[in-house]
Amino acid sequence: MDYLYDFSSKYNCLFLRGNRDEYMLEQRKIIAQGIENGRWRWNSASGNLLFAYQQLNEKDFTFFDQLPITFRYQKIGYPAVTVCHGSPVSSRERLLIEGENTKEWLKDIDTDYLICAHTHLPGELEYQGKHYYNCGSVGIAIGTCGYAQCMIIEDQCINGKIAWNPIFLKIPYDNKRVVQDIRTSGLLSKAPWYVNSNIQILLTGTDYSSQLVELANKLAKEAGEQDFTDEKYWREAAQQLGVPDYR
């Protein structure tokens, strides 16, 4: 967070609030109201979130709270762009390249360009003369282990009109060093199986994280339990999906 504050003090930056930022704000309210149900615990279901939460301070929460979930980027002489994390109305809506909701949003927005993230899957879609670009993910890049995904847009002239053209980048980094940092941080012991899934993505590009959550929940319900935080359900789900134990 200090890096973001320092960088934005030197350069013109625009920030969005993502779903994880909202989780942090919601957890803060739960704790402030003294509500036990919904509080994060050290387990595979919420331990990774609690770990992040405990690194934050009041300045960070204020920063998150002031962020928009969408904005319109307008530069004189260039086409306007709608920018959001998930969708223009929700940081948690997934706009996949082939998704029907993606096409609906392209029809609904009042710009010809929509830039999103959230899915961790970079790509582009042209639909009815409008353009959807997903920049992918820097931290948890699916399908490209050892690379951080990001995107820049460049202006180009097409048939006498200015248009935005995406350039999708893959930036190499030391993913094994990141995994070692995760191990030494103690995070693996606080949220073992979800973090194991994250490490699998970092090392192989293979993502089972959402399936892991769904299967652990399903196994718990089949056992007659509503609470799926017991690690035995996560361990069984991981074994069925092929998520290794990196501890």
Where are these regions (language model features)?
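Active-site environment of divalent metal-dependent phosphoester hydrolases
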Residues: 20-25, 89, 115-126, 140-143
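Acidic, His/Gly-rich catalytic cores of divalent-metal-dependent hydrolytic chemistry
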Residues: 127-135, 139-247
